[in-house]
Amino acid sequence: MKLNKDHVSAPKFNILFFIIVFCVLLSSLFATNSSFGQDNLRKAEKSFRDWSVFVSKDDPEMCFIASQSIKGEAFRNNQKLSSVNREKGTLYIIKILSKDSEHEGTFYAGYPLQVGSKAILEIDNKEKIVFFAHPSPKAKAEKDHAWAQKYDQKKLVDYLKKGSKAVMSAISHRNTVTKDTFMLTGFSDALSELEKRCKAN
């Protein structure tokens, strides 16, 4: 099992997007009350099956929907590993308030990604969206996150609305390939709720 690691130009990261990601990087695990547990985040405003809506406590204009992987697998040298030291993968869609109806997708891997590598999100074994790890990471949030390109954002949201399951394949700094499975039940409802709750003043 191999992942394409060809070098590509780095995506341009939205400042607001990075701030929100930084707010949630300390933990990707959902608690039983659907809260990320950070001081600057509220509990989930509302949950729709596999997806939950979050709003920043300090800035209500910062908000996103998120879902944690229901299954994680790891491979090295084409052999499946029985266990790896990592947190669960999390997929985010973040509302960009400075741009009407625009969103940004990001993936929290739960481990340091290979620098500049690609992570491939495949929806229903048909559609694919490429996420990119940071080409020169320094902060922790730059090491364990991957971002979709701006030109793929609308396509990503459309695919997730129509799909039932998505699998993210990524590669770690130790050349371990991971596959995280996300269910898409409730995605459209969560996105609609996000639009209602997260509006610029």
Task: State what each model feature region is.
Residues 18-31:
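Bacterial N-terminal signal peptides
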Residues 16-17, 114:
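Hydrophobic alpha-helical segments and their boundary regions
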Residues 9, 27-28, 35:
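Serine residues within intrinsically disordered or low-complexity segments
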Residues 13, 31-32:
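Low-complexity, intrinsically disordered segments with a bias for serine/threonine
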Residues 1-14:
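N-terminal secretory signal peptides that target proteins for export/translocation
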Residues 36-201:
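A generic "folded-domain core" signal
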